[in-house]
């Protein structure tokens, strides 16, 4: 998208948010996620929250894991730093705040390895944000003032079906879930995750919720495809309802 198109689309984020919500019926508003490099202007306020006491290894953060910011970002816009994300070392790694070597020294990463929940090869193969950010900004897509890098939605099984129909090449991932943000940003790909036990415990996501991500630069394209898919699905539902009358 050209700079001229970006300027002309600045006021379209509320409309795109509404269209996404109508098509996918998410459980919360779409969240815009923007990665800010050192030296870039950050207009979003810092999220003010105290840090709990660090554990015996010195690990703490503003929230139990960075995925918790997804929950807050549905209703407020704020900027976060590496320290804010630091209680979850896997999330800090996938978001570019830690290198693989740094993450491997953290006690929570050792804990997941020792438990057998995930192995080193799986972590080494995770997609990650390649450039360390100065900050990550979260907020409702409807309130965005510029194109976000990624838009994240919490959706149902119905929403996942609709998105997969609209974007057949969409990736469907498992744990640790946060890596789908890196997939969208670095690979320009639409992706979804069935979730992760750690993330569900920390965020309070309901069992029926899933997460999906759309690259900011593909929002218009994907939204249009979703709307076309919804129309087709409605016609099939109507057909099935008429056909089912024979069984009444």
Q: For each predicted feature, which ranges?
A:
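Acidic, serine/proline-rich low-complexity intrinsically disordered regions
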Residues: 3-248
């Amino acid at each position: 998208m050209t700079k001229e198109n970006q300027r002309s689309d600045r006021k379209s984020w509320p409309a795109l948010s509404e269209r996404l919500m109508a098509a996918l019926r998410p459980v919360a508003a779409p969240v815009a996620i923007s990665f800010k490099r050192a030296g870039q202007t950050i207009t979003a306020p810092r999220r003010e929250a105290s840090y709990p006491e660090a554990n015996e290894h010195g690990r703490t953060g503003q929230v139990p894991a960075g995925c918790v910011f997804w929950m807050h970002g549905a209703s407020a816009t704020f900027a976060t730093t590496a320290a804010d994300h630091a209680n979850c070392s896997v999330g800090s790694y996938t978001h570019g705040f830690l290198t693989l070597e740094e993450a491997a020294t953290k006690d929570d990463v050792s804990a997941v390895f020792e438990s057998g929940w995930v192995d080193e090869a799986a972590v080494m193969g995770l997609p990650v944000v390649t450039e360390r950010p100065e900050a990550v900004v979260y907020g409702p897509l409807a309130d965005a003032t510029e194109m976000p890098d990624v838009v994240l939605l919490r959706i149902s099984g119905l929403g996942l079906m609709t998105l997969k129909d609209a974007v057949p090449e969409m990736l469907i991932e498992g744990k640790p879930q946060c890596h789908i943000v890196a997939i969208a940003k670095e690979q320009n790909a639409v992706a979804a995750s069935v979730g992760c036990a750690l993330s569900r415990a920390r965020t309070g996501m309901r069992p029926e919720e899933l997460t999906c991500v759309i690259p900011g630069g593909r929002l218009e394209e994907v939204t249009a495809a979703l709307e076309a898919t919804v129309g087709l699905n409605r016609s099939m539902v109507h057909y099935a309802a008429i056909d089912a009358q024979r069984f009444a």
